[in-house]
């Protein structure tokens, strides 16, 4: 199975505009720069697939239903030309709960008690397992992403869908890698969050890393 994991392009949240406008996370859109990133990297990826003789006739796009991942996939697909497009709620971003849309440097000031409890969990259990107040931990995201893997295995076995382009979010992308390759929580802690529109390639049981991290 050939899989391309793709983080969304630059969003309003990445430049802090969602906090000012109080935009719900699932409705945060790409910036104009983010749309350009997605368009340019989509062209790059289409050329890459052609150069590597990757057959897209049975390819499928999976994406998080958030607006920014939808927009990213649409810009990429201007070049990929894939008609089979599906969404899955397990591909959504880590839920930040009380801290959603709040800059991390403001967590302690705005929510001192909740922040103290979160830091206690980080100290006692590690950041991978520590759950954000009213939100999720990376561990929680890893559990739900494992459910999605069952879907793509079934599609491969029953319908021969063997090339996937998965448009998702930073934490979700890394937990996918953790589950697919049985990486450790320590690996997750050391693994950098991908930049916008970075593409991670998986060929069967081989992690080829980010192929456009220029």
Segments and roles (model prediction):
Residues 1-2, 41-44, 51, 82, ...:
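Acidic, low-complexity terminal tails and accessory targeting/binding regions
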Residues 8, 89-90, 169:
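Active-site glycine-centered loops adjacent to acidic/histidine catalytic or metal-binding residues
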Residues 24-28, 77-144, 210-213:
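Phosphate-handling substructures
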Residues 11, 172-173:
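Short active-site segment of divalent metal-dependent hydrolases/proteases
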Residues 63-64, 143, 167-168:
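Short beta-strand scaffold positions
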Residues 3, 59, 160-170:
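Generic beta-sheet signal
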Residues 146, 150:
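Helix-loop module immediately N-terminal to the HCX5R catalytic loop
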Residues 2-83:
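Active-site-proximal alpha-helix that buttresses catalytic centers in soluble enzyme cores
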């Amino acid at each position: 199975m050939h899989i391309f994991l793709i983080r969304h392009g630059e969003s309003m949240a990445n430049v802090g505009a969602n906090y000012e406008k109080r935009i719900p996370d699932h409705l945060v859109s790409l910036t104009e720069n983010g749309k350009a990133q997605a368009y340019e990297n989509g062209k790059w990826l289409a050329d890459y697939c052609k150069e590597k003789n990757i057959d897209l006739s049975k390819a499928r796009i999976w994406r998080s239903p958030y607006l920014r991942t939808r927009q990213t996939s649409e810009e990429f697909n201007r070049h990929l030309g894939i008609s089979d497009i599906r969404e899955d709620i397990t591909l959504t971003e880590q839920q930040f709960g009380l801290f959603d849309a709040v800059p991390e440097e403001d967590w302690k000031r705005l929510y001192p008690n909740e922040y103290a409890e979160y830091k206690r969990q980080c100290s006692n259990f590690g950041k991978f397992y520590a759950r954000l107040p009213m939100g999720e931990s990376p561990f929680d995201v890893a559990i739900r992403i494992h459910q999605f893997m069952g879907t793509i295995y079934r599609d491969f076995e029953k319908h021969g869908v063997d090339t996937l382009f998965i448009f998702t979010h930073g934490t979700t992308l890394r937990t996918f890698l953790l589950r697919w390759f049985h990486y450790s929580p320590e690996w997750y802690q050391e693994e950098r969050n991908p930049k916008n529109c970075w593409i991670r390639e998986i060929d069967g049981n081989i992690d080829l890393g980010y192929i456009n991290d220029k």
